[in-house]
């Protein structure tokens, strides 16, 4: 290891977004990529043409992008308000925009836990980037479990971890939850939400709503009265802009102002800002196609549920989560599916299968039935 590097980095492993990519970074051709929870349909051709026109006619490539994201923030605030009981709670001062939600996660950790000021709490299995990002920054991670039948957070264990004092560990300063959770697909229950509301103001509650558009359940309205809550969302899923890396946070103005202080200047390219603004302006037509995801998710569930070797759970997101009798058998099924042309993600002891197109889902079902019929 290079002598100028932090010693703890030697034990870290780089995140691999698409394990099927070869050494040159090129994804294997013909592989159904159902491992990243991307929307299975690309942007419509007419929207791509509008983006191309904007690039040619409006974007000055020699100029830096809008560093304050002002137009996009206003558009996001308008969109967020549509799902709230009072449609004027949120304005641009409640919004911060990142180069993907990953940048916002890192910024939140920098503002709360750096230099042994705090630790984070996660309930696993969950989105791996909370742990990965914390570890790259030298921030301790405290993990608690979930109910193996429902995947509800073990709130008693979580509360005990928060109250515990350990000699070599700073206090927990951030609690990360996903609503609905990835990879398991379950939304936060009333009991889990009530537990989050009991957390003291010196603990930041981060609620990741990356899959909000698929479940239409949000806790964004809570930020008006809870200065220690923040909501994360993304344009990478339902809005089909994974290539553009646009994430955003919704929180009280005081917390947002701190995030704005520490984020990198010009962190979001002008073209990505244009794409997000265009997607929001066309949200009715884009989000209408979520109906396809719901239909296909239900079809996958109904087709897989009768298989004796599989255990699966209802999902409120754009994926389903399955397990076999052992983790080894589950992992092997994932490898066998990849060999047949379907790439899904093995995580948390189960397989997370993104809902694809009708044709992709047909192939997934055929291949699973073929493998488990042996």
Curated annotation (Swiss-Prot):
Entry keywords, A to Z: Amino-acid biosynthesis, Aminotransferase, Histidine biosynthesis, Pyridoxal phosphate, Transferase
CDD domains, per database record: AAT_like
One GO BP: L-histidine biosynthetic process
Domain of life: Bacteria
GO molecular function: histidinol-phosphate transaminase activity; pyridoxal phosphate binding
Pfam hit, one: Aminotran_1_2
Gene3D superfamilies in UniProt: Aspartate Aminotransferase, domain 1 (3.90.1150.10), Type I PLP-dependent aspartate aminotransferase-like (Major domain) (3.40.640.10)
Reaction(s) the record says it catalyses: L-histidinol phosphate + 2-oxoglutarate = 3-(imidazol-4-yl)-2-oxopropyl phosphate + L-glutamate
PTM-bearing positions, type N6-(pyridoxal phosphate)lysine: 237
The protein's required cofactors: pyridoxal 5'-phosphate
Family designation: Belongs to the class-II pyridoxal-phosphate-dependent aminotransferase family. Histidinol-phosphate aminotransferase subfamily.
UniProt-listed NCBIfam families: PRK02610.1
Name of the protein: Histidinol-phosphate aminotransferase
Gene assigned in the entry: hisC
């Amino acid at each position: 290891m290079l002598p100028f590097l932090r010693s703890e980095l030697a034990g870290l492993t780089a995140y691999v977004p698409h394990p099927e990519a070869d050494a040159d970074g090129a994804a294997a051709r013909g592989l159904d990529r159902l491992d990243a929870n991307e929307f299975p349909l690309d942007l419509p051709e007419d929207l791509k043409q509008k983006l191309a026109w904007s690039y040619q006619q409006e974007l000055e490539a020699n100029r830096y992008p809008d560093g304050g994201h002002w137009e996009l923030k206003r558009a996001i605030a308008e969109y967020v308000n549509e799902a709230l009981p009072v449609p004027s709670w949120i304005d641009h001062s409640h919004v911060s925009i990142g180069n993907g939600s990953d940048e916002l996660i890192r910024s939140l950790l920098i503002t709360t836990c750096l230099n042994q000021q705090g630790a984070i709490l996660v309930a696993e299995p969950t989105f791996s980037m909370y742990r990965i990002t914390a570890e790259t920054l030298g921030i301790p991670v405290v993990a608690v479990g979930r109910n193996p039948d429902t995947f509800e957070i073990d709130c008693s264990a979580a509360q005990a971890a928060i109250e515990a004092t350990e000699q070599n560990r700073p206090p927990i300063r951030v609690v990360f939850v996903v609503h609905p959770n990835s990879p398991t697909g379950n939304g936060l229950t009333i009991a889990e939400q009530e537990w989050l509301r009991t957390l003291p103001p010196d603990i930041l509650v981060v609620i990741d709503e990356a899959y909000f558009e698929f479940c239409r359940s949000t806790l964004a309205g809570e930020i008006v009265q809870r200065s220690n809550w923040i909501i994360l969302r993304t344009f990478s899923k339902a809005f089909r802009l994974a290539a553009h890396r646009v994430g955003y946070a919704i929180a009280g103005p005081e917390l947002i102002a701190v995030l704005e202080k520490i984020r990198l200047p010009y962190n979001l390219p002008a073209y990505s800002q244009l794409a997000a603004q265009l997607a929001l302006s066309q949200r009715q037509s884009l989000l209408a196609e979520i109906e396809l995801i719901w239909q296909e998710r239900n079809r996958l569930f109904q087709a897989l549920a009768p298989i004796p070797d599989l255990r699966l759970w209802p999902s409120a997101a754009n994926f389903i989560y399955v397990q076999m009798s052992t983790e080894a058998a589950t992992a092997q099924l994932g490898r066998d599916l990849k060999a047949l042309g379907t790439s899904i993600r093995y995580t948390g002891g189960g397989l997370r299968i993104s809902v694809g197109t009708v044709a992709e889902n047909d192939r997934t079902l055929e291949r699973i039935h073929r493998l488990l019929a042996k």
